[in-house]
């Protein structure tokens, strides 16, 4: 639908019978009103043409071929001449055949029918509004019992009988036996009410503002009651309060959306456009039909039978009429939700029919498969793997995916740089994977962000922008810090990649959707790019090292290491003074270089020369040992620190006892802080 602000939107909810009729009815130029489907037929078995007033009628839903009526006459669509725009013989309009994708029909039901989604789905909206048990309402809907009409002025058969009960379940089988169809209708219209008509009457009599006021008063009264000793009674009161809250919210929703409660009971049943429930001819002349067509036929058959009972057969017992109304109700229930009342309806091959609910809901439903998750151009999909060397705003695209996504841009680059004379030559170079193709692809990707999306997209961080780079393999590489926003992990999850084409989309991706600009949760404001899972384990391994102090390492042989930096077996170890000391390094580059040359391990303790830091110098920790040298200098040895002083007690240098893992982590943090300050200074 399109609102007054020209915004296209989709609204799902209850509609009035007048709206259903407006969707389906058409007035032909000769004044004839069409739109009602009255026959359960589809195509004629001889001519293979749609049956008139059937489920595929061309008068109701439009022509199968554009501009050609059922008689075979042809008119030019959009011609402004005074030629008639419909065939006077068959009544088919000369319009585009695409009208069969959205033109609806309707079935006029012989009796009211409740919408099973509002009755049987939990919570039951009808039971909530009427404040009645669901089992009691089901008995009314399926004609298991009736209730007396509240007629105060006129004397009725039930009043003379002295029955003031609400339900007359004991008369379910006795009352209809005394009447024929005509007599039973008169009796039912005066004395009792049953079926969906009884529900419709009660819903129509509701005053929603009064329901809200009464529910609020009762909720306050229950809230003022003190807890009792009986736990069961307290739970009962709590459930009643929750029910009243739901009832008030539902009534407010009906008022806010201008929906009448009686619309939950159907008098007109919409018929889907035929293109949404097609019949397809396959090899061998066989036909494949949508299950919806068979369910519609079932409804029409039973509805026509009920019409015949009410109009022609005046000697039919009333019990048979009630039974047929129940069959119509069950047929409509099966159309909306097959199996909601128990055993589902099956075809001759014992296959369950797919109803509206089966077509709409679920991963393979209409919304998730063809509207939300449909395939689009300039998109791809692959498994995600961790890319720990990537920046936060980058992602790795496999070469095969990247060349397909950016193929048009690469073709334009090849032609502009005179590597190809036309599109055909450019495509051949791409198929042959010439080196110049990858160079141009690199240039194209540098200035073009991509969007990564992981279904289901439940919040705005489910789709983010990244700067792509080429990687080997067939998987998309992703920084582990952005996984929490996507609710993704690396156990086989798949993600879709999209290319924003327009300049507006690219600007939006860069300014609003880049991953490094979405570090906080939009819901609560907490950081969402935090280390989890593998990153925490990696940080632990990186910084675990040997946490014992220098004394423990000196006197505890269990933590001593030999010159090859390997663990020593406790049983075979013997302490000797010939073992090498822990190595000294002048800077972090030398320490990391020694690790890469495999001269030390990641958690090997070492001494690293450090700059003069006032926080280290002013430490109040007492030295463990002091070593004096022959030239007058001396070394103050602390738990994780060594200070070299001169004769005048001036600090010459400082050594920190650390590991390669700690050095690597410190360098990463330092580079990140420096990059942040450079970005801030550049921005100012």
From Swiss-Prot:
<dbReference type="InterPro" id="IPR044893">
    <property type="entry name" value="RNA_pol_Rpb1_clamp_domain"/>
</dbReference>
<comment type="subunit">
    <text>In plastids the minimal PEP RNA polymerase catalytic core is composed of four subunits: alpha, beta, beta', and beta''. When a (nuclear-encoded) sigma factor is associated with the core the holoenzyme is formed, which can initiate transcription.</text>
</comment>
<keyword id="KW-0479">Metal-binding</keyword>
<dbReference type="InterPro" id="IPR006592">
    <property type="entry name" value="RNA_pol_N"/>
</dbReference>
<dbReference type="GO" id="GO:0003677">
    <property type="term" value="F:DNA binding"/>
</dbReference>
<keyword id="KW-0808">Transferase</keyword>
<protein>
    <recommendedName>
        <fullName>DNA-directed RNA polymerase subunit beta'</fullName>
        <ecNumber>2.7.7.6</ecNumber>
    </recommendedName>
</protein>
<feature type="binding site">
    <location>
        <position position="69"/>
    </location>
    <ligand>
        <name>Zn(2+)</name>
    </ligand>
</feature>
<comment type="similarity">
    <text>Belongs to the RNA polymerase beta' chain family. RpoC1 subfamily.</text>
</comment>
<keyword id="KW-0934">Plastid</keyword>
<feature type="binding site">
    <location>
        <position position="90"/>
    </location>
    <ligand>
        <name>Zn(2+)</name>
    </ligand>
</feature>
<feature type="binding site">
    <location>
        <position position="489"/>
    </location>
    <ligand>
        <name>Mg(2+)</name>
    </ligand>
</feature>
<keyword id="KW-0460">Magnesium</keyword>
<keyword id="KW-0862">Zinc</keyword>
<dbReference type="InterPro" id="IPR045867">
    <property type="entry name" value="DNA-dir_RpoC_beta_prime"/>
</dbReference>
<dbReference type="GO" id="GO:0006351">
    <property type="term" value="P:DNA-templated transcription"/>
</dbReference>
<keyword id="KW-0240">DNA-directed RNA polymerase</keyword>
<dbReference type="GO" id="GO:0008270">
    <property type="term" value="F:zinc ion binding"/>
</dbReference>
<dbReference type="GO" id="GO:0000287">
    <property type="term" value="F:magnesium ion binding"/>
</dbReference>
<dbReference type="InterPro" id="IPR034678">
    <property type="entry name" value="RNApol_RpoC1"/>
</dbReference>
<keyword id="KW-0804">Transcription</keyword>
<dbReference type="InterPro" id="IPR042102">
    <property type="entry name" value="RNA_pol_Rpb1_3_sf"/>
</dbReference>
<dbReference type="InterPro" id="IPR000722">
    <property type="entry name" value="RNA_pol_asu"/>
</dbReference>
<dbReference type="GO" id="GO:0009507">
    <property type="term" value="C:chloroplast"/>
</dbReference>
<dbReference type="GO" id="GO:0000428">
    <property type="term" value="C:DNA-directed RNA polymerase complex"/>
</dbReference>
<dbReference type="GO" id="GO:0005739">
    <property type="term" value="C:mitochondrion"/>
</dbReference>
<keyword id="KW-0548">Nucleotidyltransferase</keyword>
<dbReference type="GO" id="GO:0003899">
    <property type="term" value="F:DNA-directed RNA polymerase activity"/>
</dbReference>
<feature type="binding site">
    <location>
        <position position="493"/>
    </location>
    <ligand>
        <name>Mg(2+)</name>
    </ligand>
</feature>
<keyword id="KW-0150">Chloroplast</keyword>
<dbReference type="InterPro" id="IPR007080">
    <property type="entry name" value="RNA_pol_Rpb1_1"/>
</dbReference>
<feature type="binding site">
    <location>
        <position position="491"/>
    </location>
    <ligand>
        <name>Mg(2+)</name>
    </ligand>
</feature>
<feature type="binding site">
    <location>
        <position position="87"/>
    </location>
    <ligand>
        <name>Zn(2+)</name>
    </ligand>
</feature>
<dbReference type="Pfam" id="PF04997">
    <property type="entry name" value="RNA_pol_Rpb1_1"/>
</dbReference>
<dbReference type="Pfam" id="PF00623">
    <property type="entry name" value="RNA_pol_Rpb1_2"/>
</dbReference>
<comment type="function">
    <text>DNA-dependent RNA polymerase catalyzes the transcription of DNA into RNA using the four ribonucleoside triphosphates as substrates.</text>
</comment>
<feature type="binding site">
    <location>
        <position position="71"/>
    </location>
    <ligand>
        <name>Zn(2+)</name>
    </ligand>
</feature>
């Amino acid at each position: 639908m399109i609102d007054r602000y020209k915004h296209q939107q989709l609204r799902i909810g209850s509609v009035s019978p007048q709206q259903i009729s407006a969707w389906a009815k058409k007035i032909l130029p000769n004044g004839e009103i069409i739109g009602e489907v009255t026959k359960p037929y589809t195509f004629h078995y001889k001519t293979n043409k749609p049956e008139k007033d059937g489920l595929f009628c061309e008068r109701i839903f439009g022509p199968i071929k554009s501009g050609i009526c059922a008689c075979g006459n042809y008119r030019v669509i959009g011609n402004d001449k005074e030629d008639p725009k419909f065939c006077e013989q068959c009544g088919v309009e000369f319009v585009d055949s695409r009208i069969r994708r959205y033109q609806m029909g309707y079935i006029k039901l012989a009796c009211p029918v409740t919408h099973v989604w509002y009755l049987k789905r939990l919570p039951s909206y009808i039971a909530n509004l009427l404040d009645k048990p669901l089992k009691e309402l089901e008995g009314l809907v399926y004609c298991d019992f009736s209730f007396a009409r509240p007629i105060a002025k006129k004397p009725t058969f039930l009043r003379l009988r002295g029955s003031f009960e609400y339900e007359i379940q004991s008369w379910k089988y006795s009352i209809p036996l005394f009447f024929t169809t005509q007599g039973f209708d008169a009796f039912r219209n005066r004395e009792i009410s049953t079926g969906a008509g009884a529900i419709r009457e009660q819903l129509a009599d509701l005053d929603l503002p009064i329901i809200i006021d009464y529910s609020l008063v009762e909720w306050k009264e229950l809230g003022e009651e003190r807890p009792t000793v009986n736990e069961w009674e307290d739970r009962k009161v709590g459930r009643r309060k929750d029910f009243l809250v739901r009832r008030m919210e539902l009534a407010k929703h009906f008022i806010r959306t201008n929906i009448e409660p009686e619309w939950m009971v159907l008098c007109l049943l919409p018929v889907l456009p035929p293109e949404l429930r097609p019949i397809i001819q396959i090899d061998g002349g066989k036909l494949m039909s949508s299950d919806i067509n068979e369910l519609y036929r079932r409804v029409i058959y039973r509805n026509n039978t009920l019409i015949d009972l009410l109009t022609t057969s005046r000697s039919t017992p009333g019990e048979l009429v009630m039974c047929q109304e129940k069959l119509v109700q069950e047929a409509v229930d099966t159309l909306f939700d097959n199996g909601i009342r128990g055993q589902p309806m099956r075809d001759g091959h014992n296959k369950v029919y797919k109803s509206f609910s089966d077509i709409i809901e679920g991963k393979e439903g209409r919304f998730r498969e063809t509207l939300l998750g449909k395939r689009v151009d300039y998109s791809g999909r692959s498994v995600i793997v961790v890319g720990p060397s990537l920046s936060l705003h980058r992602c790795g695209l496999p070469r095969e995916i990247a060349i397909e996504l950016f193929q048009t841009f690469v073709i334009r680059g090849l032609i502009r740089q005179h590597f190809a004379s036309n599109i055909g030559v450019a495509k051949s170079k791409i198929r042959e994977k010439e080196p110049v193709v990858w160079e141009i692809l690199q240039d194209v990707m540098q200035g073009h962000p991509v969007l990564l999306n992981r279904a289901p997209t439940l919040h705005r961080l489910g789709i983010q922008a990244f700067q792509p780079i080429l990687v080997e393999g067939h998987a998309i590489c992703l920084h582990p810090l952005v996984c929490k926003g996507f609710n993704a992990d690396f156990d086989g999850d798949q993600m879709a990649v999209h290319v924003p084409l327009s300049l507006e989309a690219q600007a939006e991706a860069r300014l609003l959707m880049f991953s490094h600009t979405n570090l906080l949760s939009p819901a609560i404001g907490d950081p969402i790019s935090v280390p989890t899972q593998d990153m925490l384990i990696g940080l632990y391994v990186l910084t675990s090292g040997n946490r014992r102090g220098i004394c423990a390492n000196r006197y505890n042989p269990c933590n001593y290491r030999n010159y090859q930096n390997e663990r020593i077996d406790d049983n075979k170890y013997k302490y000797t003074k010939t073992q090498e000391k822990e190595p000294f390094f002048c800077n972090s580059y030398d320490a990391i270089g020694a690790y890469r040359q495999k001269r030390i391990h990641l958690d090997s303790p070492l001494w690293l020369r450090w700059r003069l830091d006032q926080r280290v110098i002013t430490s109040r920790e007492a030295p463990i040992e002091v070593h004096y040298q022959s030239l007058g200098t001396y070394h103050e040895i602390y738990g994780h620190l060594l200070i070299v002083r001169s004769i005048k007690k001036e600090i010459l240098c400082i050594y920190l006892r650390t590991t390669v893992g700690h050095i690597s982590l410190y360098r990463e943090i330092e580079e990140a802080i420096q990059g942040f300050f450079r970005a801030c200074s550049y921005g100012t």
